[in-house]
Amino acid sequence: MMIYASLAVIAVAFVLFFVIQQKKLKSSETFSKSAMGFFNNLDGFTMSYALFGIKGPSGHTRAMAIDTERELICLYDANEKKKHHMLDYSVLASSEVFENEISISFFSDDSKILKLNFEKELSEDSKRVFNLSVECKFVSDEIPSFKIYTIHSNNPVDNNEYLFKKEETNKWHHLMVKIIDYNNQPVKHID
């Protein structure tokens, strides 16, 4: 009798877990459509990568799009739909969004898996080192392409100096950018 009761409890727990996960997924899909529409209608910004479900320090869900051509990152807050934050690559380090290591996977409508990894650490000379990797994986076997962008910084360099290193194979494309002036660059607030 006790065995049946235990099995029933396990079954109920499993069903509840499944229902909660489905609700979370549906909520993420709704948010992704809203954010994607927002990014697509943003003047002077062309998405290279989007979008990421990020929990900010306030607990709000945010989305992120990267414009690699203009070297801009746009952060979109679900609770502040009329306001967004535009970041240059150079201010990643001072952004409150990236205070902790982040590793996020997001499933978008067009069968892409988007993953963001952000890490920061102290180097030997106490200069901060920042790494941002963005991976875009196409689920379809017809398009077996992967892309990763890594942005890193050791020492700030001149305002206009960016260091690029590109490496291409049939599956991977790497872009490394030196983040500049990460202590002085202000975050642009755009209403």
Model-predicted regions and their roles:
Residues 84-87, 167:
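Short, well-structured alpha-helical interface segments that form or flank functional binding sites
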Residues 69, 83-85, 132:
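Core residues of folded domains in eukaryotic genome-function proteins
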Residues 79-81, 89-93, 151-156:
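A short, sequence-level motif marking secondary-structure junctions
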Residues 86-102:
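Phosphoinositide-dependent membrane-docking surfaces
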